[in-house]
Amino acid sequence: MENQKNFLTTAPYKGTRDFYPEDMRLRNWMFSVMRETVLSFGYEEYDGPILESFDLYKAKSGEEIVERQLYDFIDKGERRVAIRPEMTPTLARMVAGNLRNLPKPVRWFSIPNLWRYEQPGKGRLREHWQLNVDLFGVDSHRAELEILLIADSILKKFGAPIGSYQIKVSHRKLLDSFLKNSLKLNGDQVHGVSKLLDKKSKISSEAFETEMKPFLNNFKEQFSLIETYLNSNLETVSKIPGIDTNSVSFIQNLFQELGELGIDKQLLFDPSIIRGFDYYTGCIFEVFDTNPENRRSLYGGGRYDNLIGLFSKEQLSGIGFGLGDVTLKNFLEGHNLIPNLSREKTIFLPIMDESLFVDTFKLSKELRENEILTETMLDSAKIGKQIQIAEKKGYRYVLFLGESEIRTETVQIKDLISGEQKSLPRKGLSDTLKKDFQL
């Protein structure tokens, strides 16, 4: 019996993706739109290591991440390290390490890849890329105003129409006052109820009620108050006994100024917004997709006033958000916002004859020097086969340079979509291609 070789699988690791060229075109386009938007607000790009000390995440990340989602191991130097599940702890370490040299306010952003060990599903993978936007050194609500403007501007830059998304806003001090003052819960109860509120949208109302019972002393009265809180608006929430009215006033003032800047239609006060990370201390928000087939949180963030406390005695207020590429892609697909990303703006240059190789490459060099993307064949296969390659790669325009074109100082250009072919003068060719063919 002939021995059979066991080949390795070609599938990527569970929860990760291969990015073929067409996938990279989409990813690069998404990243470029995000990058251009954030840069327009004066932010600077940074990056950090994919490996950090385990202790950094143990101290700064949420319980769920550290206990169940972290990829961690002991390195060859017997140090416990982890692959970054989020960027904020690295950001805090970097800012604290250079705090005195950084002009305030600090406006930074990054688009790192992040890892979490969790069950892959729609909008959720083990490896993803995430835009992180952070602003340090502004205590007033103007920091929230700018961050929310950026969060809104990104989707508008992608062409998202009004009504395709909502920005839901709340405040951690509002929640804390409700749990501690209104419900009169102790530390363990506060923790348990807070976690349940955070996952309320992911479980049934019956499960929510059942899981809430162990944390409440007077279930009927307290659960009724929880329902009142979750269904309240900015006017009614302030009437709940024990509520921090300063937080309500903060959101009201923020909404007023944002409305004057034209994003009031997207804004919604929603006290059910919790944000699972333990480091949020003030205003929190989430951006939701309104598509009936993808009603979920796209991204979110909030205020974290004590983030660098582990590294420095100095106080520095901060606010930021993270936007993942997986949920963004689902949003863009759901609202038909992804443009044609084919290679129509790249010239394909076949080799008409082996003797014309150098002449053809001189032409391609001329085009590239004039910022026209050009792919040149490297051998003189049958011209029909070369055209098939161009079609398969998604090219629209093919330039032909044969002996007759060299004699007459012209080129032939063919539109593979329409089938039209015509002669162009070699002189001023790059300008003609840019003007008449939008290349």
UniProtKB/Swiss-Prot annotation:
Give me the Gene Ontology terms describing cellular component: cytoplasm
Care to name a GO molecular-function term for this sequence? histidine-tRNA ligase activity
Q: Where in the cell is it found?
A: Cytoplasm
Q: What is its EC number?
A: 6.1.1.21
Which Pfam families does the annotation name? HGTP_anticodon, tRNA-synt_His
UniProt enzyme class: ligase
Paired cysteines (S-S):
none
Name the PROSITE patterns on file.
AA_TRNA_LIGASE_II
The catalytic activity, as recorded, is: tRNA(His) + L-histidine + ATP = L-histidyl-tRNA(His) + AMP + diphosphate + H(+)
UniProt keywords, alphabetically: Aminoacyl-tRNA synthetase, ATP-binding, Cytoplasm, Ligase, Nucleotide-binding, Protein biosynthesis
Q: Which domain of life is it from?
A: Bacteria
Q: Which GO terms describe its biological process?
A: histidyl-tRNA aminoacylation
Q: Which InterPro entries match?
A: aa-tRNA-synth_II, aa-tRNA-synth_II/BPL/LPL, Anticodon-bd, Anticodon-bd_dom_sf, His-tRNA-ligase, HisRS-like_core, HisRS/HisZ
Q: Indicate the principal place this protein occupies in or around the cell.
A: cytoplasm
Enumerate the Gene3D superfamilies for this protein: Anticodon-binding domain, Bira Bifunctional Protein, Domain 2
Q: Which NCBIfam families match?
A: hisS (TIGR00442)
Family membership noted in the UniProt record? Belongs to the class-II aminoacyl-tRNA synthetase family.
Q: How does it assemble?
A: Homodimer.
Q: Which PANTHER family match?
A: HISTIDINE--TRNA LIGASE, MITOCHONDRIAL-RELATED (PTHR43707:SF1), HISTIDYL-TRNA SYNTHETASE (PTHR43707)
Cross-referenced HAMAP family = His_tRNA_synth (MF_00127)
Q: What is this protein called?
A: Histidine--tRNA ligase
Q: Which organism is it from?
A: Leptospira interrogans serogroup Icterohaemorrhagiae serovar copenhageni (strain Fiocruz L1-130)
For this protein's source organism, the top of the classification is: Bacteria, Pseudomonadati, Spirochaetota, Spirochaetia, Leptospirales
